[in-house]
Amino acid sequence: MALLEICCYSMECALTAQQNGADRVELCAAPKEGGLTPSLGVLKSVRQRVTIPVHPIIRPRGGDFCYSDGEFAAILEDVRTVRELGFPGLVTGVLDVDGNVDMPRMEKIMAAAGPLAVTFHRAFDMCANPLNTLNNLAELGVARVLTSGQKSDALQGLSKIMELIAHGDAPIIMAGAGVRAENLHHFLDAGVLEVHSSAGAWQASPMRYRNQGLSMSSDAHADEYSRYVVDGAAVAEMKGIIERHQAK
């Protein structure tokens, strides 16, 4: 049966995902940045309360995946922290200036991760040659690749995802970006073994007082009175679709 991973941005969302049938959680911060490394406090609270596998993302900033020496040092430190806290896996990825896997740096990440299952995230979708990259990741011992098939969403990239699956058994190819209940059957019919979804929506802040027109970010139009939360019903619906597909 296909595995359902839910992207979560808080301990509460991780619990919601777990309670509604998620098989695994990718734990992130900063949804507007596409997911950054969670704080130590969030990592500890999730580790204490969530019982399904949780894989934190290790990504120090938004943007591309070619990092400075200082950023890479932070990545290694965060990998060690996640390992010490007892998480079963993590999500990360590093490219060089030419869009190839930065093999020396990824080797250091794999060594720091030790027995943890490493997912190479959507840095894969920014790589120059996906099949060569997949071979490099297999050589490194990466467990899985999260990809949209190098398109803006996974449904558009499904043909590339199928090509990657046909390329070999390892790493596992996990489809993500825009995967929802309404299009999930396309991925299941294509033989995708793992799917990744945020399964949520932006929710209004409970604050009654609002200083409108004030932004905490460089985006002057950012809505500071909303937050992204996992929708338990959406998770349960996706899990049900997977179970019914398996029973066919």
Swiss-Prot record:
SUPFAM superfamilies tied to this protein: CutC-like
Name of the gene this protein is made from: cutC
GO MF annotation: an example: copper ion binding
UniProt-recorded name of the protein: PF03932 family protein CutC
Superkingdom as given in the UniProt entry: Bacteria
Family matches, as Pfam families: CutC
Compartment(s) where it occurs, according to its Swiss-Prot or TrEMBL record: Cytoplasm
Record Gene3D superfamilies: Copper homeostasis (CutC) domain
